[in-house]
Amino acid sequence: MTIHQGGNSVIDNVPYSLNTNVNDSIYSEKGTGRKDAEDHTPSKITDLEKNVDHSIPSFPENDPKNYSEFVNLNPPKRPDLEHTRGSSWHTASENVNDLAANDSTRVQTPEFITQTMEDENVEVPPLERDERDAAAAHTSKANRNSARQMWAQLMASVRKFKREDEKPILKENLPAINLFEAGIPASLPIAKHFIRDKSGQPVLPIITDLIKVSVLDVEPKHNRIHSTFTIQVEYGTGPHAIRWLIYRQLRDFINLHSHFLFFEFQHRFSGRRMKLPKFPKEVLPYLVKLRGYQKILYSNPSDQLIDETHSISDISWESHSQDGDRTTGQPRHANNGRKKHGNFWTIQGNTLGVYLQEMIHNLQFFPEVNVLYSFLEFSSLGLYLAGAGTFHGKEGFATLKRNYSPTQYMLCCNTTMMKTRSQPFWIIVSESCIILCDNMLSMQPADVFIWDVDFEITRKNFRKAHSKDTNEKIRLSHHSFKIKNRQKVMKLSVRSGRWLQQFINSVQVAQGLTAWCEIHRFDSFAPVRTNVAVQWMVDARDHMWNVSRAIKNAKRCIMIHGWWLSPELQMRRPYSMAHKWRIDRILNEKAHEGVMVYIMIYRNIDATIPIDSFHTKEHLQSLHPNIYVIRSPSHFRQNALFWAHHEKLVVVDDAITFIGGIDLCFGRYDTPQHILYDDKPVADKTGLCEQTWRGKDYSNARVHDFFDLTEPYKDMYDRLAVPRMGWHDVSMCIIGQPARDAARHFVQRWNYLIQCKKPARKTPLLIPPPDFTTDQLTDSQLTGTCEVQVLRSAGLWSLGLVDTVEQSIQNAYVTCIEKSEHFIYIENQFFVTSTTCEGTTIENRVGDALVERIIRAHKNNEKWRGVIMIPLLPGFEGQIDLQEGGSLRLIVECQYRSICHGEHSIFGRLNAKGIDGSKYLRFYGLRGWAHLGENHELVTEMIYVHAKILIADDRVAVIGSANINERSLLGNRDSEIAAVIRDTLTIDSKMDGKPYKVGKFAHTLRKRLMREHLGLETDVLEQREYNMDGLDRDTEWKRVEVWTPDEGNAINGSAYTAEELKMKYRSQSQFTTTPDILRKAEKSMKKLDQRVSLIPSSIEFNIKTQKDKVEFEKNYEKSKKGPDVIANALVGGIPLSLKTKEDSLYELSKFSQCGEDQRPMVLKDPDHLVPEPSRPHCGNGLVFYDDIPLLEVNPISGETIPKFDASSFEDPVCDEFFEDIWSKVASNNTTIYRHIFRCVPDDEMLTWESYNEWKKYGKRFKEEQARWRQEELSNLHETHEKSENDPKNPKAGSQGSGNTSASEDSKTEKPKTRTNNGLQVPDKRVVYDLLRGIRGQLVELPLKWMSTESNARNWLSSIDKIPPLEIYD
């Protein structure tokens, strides 16, 4: 044979049409006696070059016996070429290297032989013939060897072309976009839908051209049929291709081929032939040594399988031949007994990979291809989940033997739980759960088994009954296993122990990639997440605006979990300018766009809680099939007659979540000013002078609870007589990984409710979203500077937790109080803790933590303070002295027993230790006043504190839906959700006059709340500080040391400055506002009536015509549009750029590039800072004109009213702020409200007798105001002229300034009142002078109210004690 260093040999030009069986060989006849020719291993071309002198047999020149014997035993198979064998062979002295050097000579050999054959037909004289024969005898052997060599080369070329013809066409995978441009691949999934097997199941709709299979490794075993192959399956192209590993044994391939042989036999009778590829017999592990393979049991490192990055088309087919080297055509016997090169396991694996690829290609249009897809672990849902970037684990069939949950029997809700099923499920091991589907084609899970800290998977141990040998290996069950979490136990059975072990291994790998099975801080279900973007929002205006924007931008799914949801709620105001922002219209629009909407609400009992959840469900589900609503709990079925789902949660696209105390329902919308009246008409011709709280949104639960909710725009009260009750609340927006933690909580509850009671409408189970990767967060700019952990209260009835109750919210509250160094700030709807009331022990430990912390501060002589804000009265309907006020009295009793009444209260326990509790802990509430109706009647109403927050040391904050009572904190009653936030971005501040590092999130939130309560214009202040800050919260990912409370006494963890976090600064050139625009906005802001309208009064009168209205609406809509911003700026973070126009005040929004996030307020300009508000409002939420003096001295107490500004709130502990400003303002406001309105509750009201006297005073005060109005009407003309000429005496109620005839001197005489024969009503002048002395809405919580009656056990009636106390505490 000839080996060329370059180019092709002559016989390489044999036409492709020459097709010979690959087993044909001129040396294939039996009887050669060369057994080494039977044993062949593929060898590489480099090996042939090294051993070329052994590849061709040689014979002695003078040994005709050997020659003739060789010729006779190996005749050529081609008769037409038989005569071409020459007259002689090469001698032994000639080797292949010599032949290779004489290629040109051998090339001429055919012509020489042909000429000789022609000469034989010519008549030659005898003498010449003898001479000629003598000359030919000398070269006969060499010529014959040359012919034989030529024949071998010719046949090798024929085999080479035949192999190329038979080789499968294995193409490199093209990009998916190129495949779909062809048109045909895109139609294949649809076509496969119509191909169905005998059971009616369609073919899995996948594109086979995107599948690649390769064997990466082989684990040999002595029993070689049990060798395990590691197979990589790839679906897709490019960097987003989905890859996973499966493990199969050789017998699995044999079983697979046997199945398809049976299918092929069936298809013969149907007239449709199945082109089944032949099973590669060379992979069978028999006679490995005799067949010439290296007998090794482990892979040779120098002869590895193909790399996972190579496609199957890169496999060298020539290296797999058993007939010889298919590249060179070397005959098999030419090895001359040499052991063949190549690892059998490598060849076996690669050959099986090629076999699988052929199967995929040939069977793609047969219904039985699903058997092959199940062999490769394909499924519709598995591909969908893996395409989202999640972990893709083991898949396969398993039979459910038992599905047991103790809650299903404890709570009598076992109607929908699947106990067993003979039909096997398709099981998918995902990143943090195990999914059960009806089959591999299903996209809806039949059950979802979510992992938690108690998750475990076990196999039952068996020991032979007759064996007593303890050293004997315990035999494990080969088929059954059990999985367990906090909710239930499932027993499953699989087809083999191998499959089970693979399943367990896959679960263990997934567990190593997730943190859901670990114990977390505060014993929460969720881990601590770092580098999170968070933004707080105070009051529902900001919350609802941002929620509406997030829902509007939803792309995949919306999850809403609330106590109440009003479908007709207007998310933005005014109504006429934002009619499309009604929540049912937004959800309907998104559902038509394909977004899935899932809503969970509390299933109310109409007789006690009139929120009409049935109306909510029926209305929303009637809008679109993509909207699903579940009401819960089923009170009797789940044994939850008294408990409620109290979470307030919105999750959009598993990326952004809103957590707090605000429900999306009537009565919650409010602004920081907390205006108490809204008596304007519904709308005028322009649509601008209209109500802010329309219909049921104008509410006062203290007067009357909600009713007739099917008519949402029908008023419940007379607006001219009943003020609304202001609603103060706090929420936050979290972006990034904690949003997926909140979504996981929602999914867990959603699935549990479906299993407890099957909905009337088919409702899908949900799958928890996978965790974000660091790259996904940074690439999507979903990072921030906060450390966030989601918390919850959950138990048996609410989440099906067995043998455990999660109370991580209570743990966080207690830990933050215990670890605080200087200060805590709490706002909550209730305060019932750590006491004994009516023989019932209150168990939650918040009160205990406060007592212990105060005792430690007193012992160590530390200055530690606590501020607690709660409503002045619970928000329940009814008068305190009437029978229907029983619930009100019972909750008040629990609260005062927790705070100050009795030896078990906080102050009682501190007094027993000789500690004055008021030195460390203060309780406050909120109250406002307003004018109602045409008579401008003065009224007061409390502002309901509904927030649920805790701030410790201005470093950490807890925000959520949990109240401080037994229902919310114990975990086995109401279900709650919250989050603890610690900002690693620190700023310089002070505590007790000393420098102190504080977290920016908690510090700014605490200042924002305190400023609002003391009456400062918070919107303007936020804008002013925002312009001064100049930071863009676009941060790099930072490795953070989380706060671990068990390792220290302080709230510690990583803390960084803006420079250390590499935070960017906004460019000054981005601000284009001029000083003229600033002055214009300043002037307009002074006349901005924030009660009901967004339009400054200086512009409102100019909008008179329809044309003006259209122009205004155009500008308004335009102002809401802004460029997209990063997630940190989405809900009140710092935008990337700020731009304003000189011709529009409506683009001057609170957060610039979130044009739809906040109502228009003020402009932004770093060069000309927004001026600080010069004065707080006087309790009614409206700022007085600067030329109207405020009262500087309280005429009742004779004390100076504190002066303060925005900079006074930095240090909440120092006496200069806490005692001289905060506490004194609250005391001053309380005194003024007491003197004017005789409010309930109050510290001077100790008995029922005094309570009745104060009620009579309220009637007399109302009558007295009517008399004032009559006097005004009789002197209307004189009063009008006086109000125009005297700026210090504006019309009462016209701008909220009151109608007063105050002198230039702001001091007034101390008013006189009678208390012996009834309380005297002060005159008009005194009343309005006193109102000018109120600062903000902060008042003291009266701790002595009705204490005499409470101590005498005369506070609660016998009827009040009938209901269980657990309902209220």
Swiss-Prot record:
Biological-process GO terms, alphabetical: meiotic cell cycle; phosphatidic acid biosynthetic process; phosphatidylinositol metabolic process; phosphatidylinositol-mediated signaling; phospholipid catabolic process; sporulation resulting in formation of a cellular spore
Database matches in InterPro entries: PLipase_D/transphosphatidylase, PLipase_D_euk, PLipase_D_fam, PX_dom
Superkingdom classification of source:
Eukaryota
Sorted alphabetically, the Gene Ontology cellular component annotations on this record are:
cytosol
UniProt keywords, alphabetically: Cytoplasm, Hydrolase, Lipid degradation, Lipid metabolism, Meiosis, Repeat, Sporulation
PLD phosphodiesterase domain boundaries: 641-668, 941-968
Q: Which SUPFAM superfamilies has this protein been placed in?
A: Phospholipase D/nuclease
Q: Which reaction does it catalyse?
A: a 1,2-diacyl-sn-glycero-3-phosphocholine + H2O = a 1,2-diacyl-sn-glycero-3-phosphate + choline + H(+)
Primary location group = cytoplasm
Keyword Oxidoreductase in record = no
Regions of biased composition (Polar residues) lie at 1292-1303
EC number(s) per entry? 3.1.4.4
Task: Report the residue ranges that make up the PX domain in this protein.
Answer: 208-379
Region: Disordered; residue ranges are 27-90, 318-340, 1277-1320
Q: Where in the cell is it found?
A: Cytoplasm
User: Keyword Cytoplasm: yes or no?
Assistant: yes
What GO terms are given for molecular function? phosphatidylinositol-3-phosphate binding; phospholipase D activity
- Show the ranges annotated as biased composition (Basic and acidic residues): 31-53, 1277-1289
Per its Swiss-Prot or TrEMBL record, what regulates the activity? Activity is slightly stimulated by oleate.
Which PANTHER family does this one have?
PHOSPHOLIPASE (PTHR18896:SF76), PHOSPHOLIPASE D (PTHR18896)
Q: What does this protein do?
A: Required for meiosis and spore formation. Seems to be involved in the coordinate induction of late meiotic events.
Q: Which family does it belong to?
A: Belongs to the phospholipase D family.
Under which name does UniProt file this protein? Phospholipase D1
